[in-house]
């Protein structure tokens, strides 16, 4: 009979425990025919346990029924596993429920199959058998009795003394925070001249070699380069966002006026403003004084209203009365017959044209216009020569 593919070489032994004699015999026949098993049948679970107690190492597979009157199948499974821990048991039941399946597996069974067994189940039954355990059992049987204890001890000692036969174990170094701190300290000291050999000397750690330091140094530099690129990308992105928020016109205006936005002293603008205001006020005061002098017939002293201390103090404008020099008289007769006489006398120098120009300016500033039904102002320039007598 051809050997079943997947089964170990040699004939395996099996036990079938079932109180149903017909089903036990049919199962035994199919195991022998399909899988080439050497099968032993028991209709009493207690007798089967007595057999296992003396021949447990020679049994490779056990098929036991769950529902038996003499002894429950779960109790049989528990005792069988205690007698031989490596024995493989497959339970059979007419009710393959989830509860029954979980309980069988929990007690150490390989699988739960539906009863009665058919040819298809028997053909696939070997898939639930741990063939590795079966092979190890066969190897132990073959090695048993070969050589004495002294021979085995000598071979073991020779293997231990020869280091070439031992496989060298590889281990990985974990960079703890303490090692990382020493590594960064060494980099800070060495700077650009950092090499794995110099780093190892400064770190002073025995259980580390230059190759591991070189690998960690390369990773450290790659990490720094990556962080630098990420930081530059973040900065560029923030600048683009700020420019998009400001707008092209506003950003151009900000760039153009960035150099001019500098703090300046407030002293010079304040002084300039005060000076302009004082000059305007003084200018208004001069013309206001001239208008009052013409209105009330008093003497207008220009030196009192002059802002230049080095000005000519001899020039005066005299309003009213008879004075020497050039005189201008204005006579106005209104409808009521009242007479108004205004005379402006300018001394030093005595110039008729200059006097006429001054009078014209004063009349224009007062807004005097000849209108119908109102007072008409008439100005006449009188030139008195020195030869004429009063």
UniProtKB/Swiss-Prot annotation:
SUPFAM superfamilies: CheY-like, Homeodomain-like. PROSITE patterns: RESPONSE_REGULATORY (PS50110). CDD domains: REC_typeB_ARR-like. One of its GO terms (biological process) is phosphorelay signal transduction system. Two-component system major event consists of a His-to-Asp phosphorelay between a sensor histidine kinase (HK) and a response regulator (RR). In plants, the His-to-Asp phosphorelay involves an additional intermediate named Histidine-containing phosphotransfer protein (HPt). This multistep phosphorelay consists of a His-Asp-His-Asp sequential transfer of a phosphate group between first a His and an Asp of the HK protein, followed by the transfer to a conserved His of the HPt protein and finally the transfer to an Asp in the receiver domain of the RR protein. Disulfide bonds: none annotated. It comes from Oryza sativa subsp. japonica. The modification 4-aspartylphosphate is found at residue 65. GO terms for cellular component: cytosol; nucleus. InterPro entries: ARR-like (IPR045279), CheY-like_superfamily (IPR011006), Homeodomain-like_sf (IPR009057), Myb_dom_plants (IPR006447), Sig_transdc_resp-reg_receiver (IPR001789). Residues 233-271, 303-339 are annotated as: Disordered. This is Two-component response regulator ORR29. Keywords: Activator, Cytokinin signaling pathway, Cytoplasm, DNA-binding, Nucleus, Phosphoprotein, Transcription, Transcription regulation, Two-component regulatory system. Residues 13-130 form the Response regulatory domain. One of its GO terms (molecular function) is DNA binding. Disruption phenotype: Dwarf, narrow leaf, lesion mimic, low tillering and late heading phenotypes. Transcriptional activator that binds specific DNA sequence. Functions as a response regulator involved in His-to-Asp phosphorelay signal transduction system. Phosphorylation of the Asp residue in the receiver domain activates the ability of the protein to promote the transcription of target genes. May directly activate some type-A response regulators in response to cytokinins. Functions as a response regulator in response to cytokinins. Residues 257-271 have a biased composition (Polar residues). Belongs to the ARR family. Type-B subfamily. Residues 169-226 bind DNA.
């Amino acid at each position: 009979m051809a050997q079943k593919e997947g089964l170990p070489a040699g004939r395996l032994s099996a036990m079938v425990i079932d109180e149903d004699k017909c089903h036990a015999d049919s199962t035994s026949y199919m195991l022998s025919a399909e899988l080439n098993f050497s099968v032993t049948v028991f209709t009493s679970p207690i007798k089967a346990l007595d057999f296992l107690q003396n021949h447990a190492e020679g049994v490779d597979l056990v098929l036991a029924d769950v529902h038996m009157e003499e002894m429950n199948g779960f109790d049989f499974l528990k005792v069988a596993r205690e007698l031989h821990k490596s024995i493989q048991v497959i339970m059979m039941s007419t009710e393959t429920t989830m509860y029954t399946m979980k309980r069988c597996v929990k007690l150490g069974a390989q699988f739960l199959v539906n009863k009665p067994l058919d040819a298809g189940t028997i053909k696939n039954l070997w898939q639930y058998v741990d063939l590795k355990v079966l092979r190890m059992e066969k190897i132990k049987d073959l090695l048993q009795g070969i050589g004495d204890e002294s021979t085995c001890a000598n071979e073991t000692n020779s293997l231990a003394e020869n280091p070439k036969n031992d496989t060298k174990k590889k281990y990985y170094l974990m960079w703890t925070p303490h090692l990382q701190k020493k590594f960064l300290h060494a980099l800070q000291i060495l700077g650009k001249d950092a090499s794995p050999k110099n780093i190892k000397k400064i770190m002073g750690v025995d259980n580390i070699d230059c190759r591991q330091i070189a690998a960690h140094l390369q990773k450290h530099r790659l990490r720094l380069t990556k962080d630098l690129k990420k930081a530059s990308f973040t900065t560029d992105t923030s600048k683009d966002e700020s420019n998009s928020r400001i707008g092209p016109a506003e950003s151009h205006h900000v760039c153009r006026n960035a150099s001019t936005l500098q703090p300046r002293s407030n002293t010079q603008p304040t002084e300039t403003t005060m000076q302009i205001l004082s000059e305007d006020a003084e200018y208004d005061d001069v013309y206001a004084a001239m208008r009052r002098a013409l209105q009330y017939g008093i003497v207008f002293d220009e030196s009192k209203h002059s802002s230049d201390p080095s000005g000519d103090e001899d020039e005066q404008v005299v309003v009213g009365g008879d004075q020497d020099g050039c005189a201008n008289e204005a006579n106005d007769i209104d409808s009521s017959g009242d007479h108004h006489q205004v005379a402006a006398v300018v001394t030093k120098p005595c110039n008729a044209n200059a006097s006429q120009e001054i009078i014209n300016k004063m009349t224009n500033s007062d807004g005097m216009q000849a209108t119908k039904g109102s007072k008409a102002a008439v100005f006449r320039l009188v030139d008195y020569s020195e030869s004429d007598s009063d």
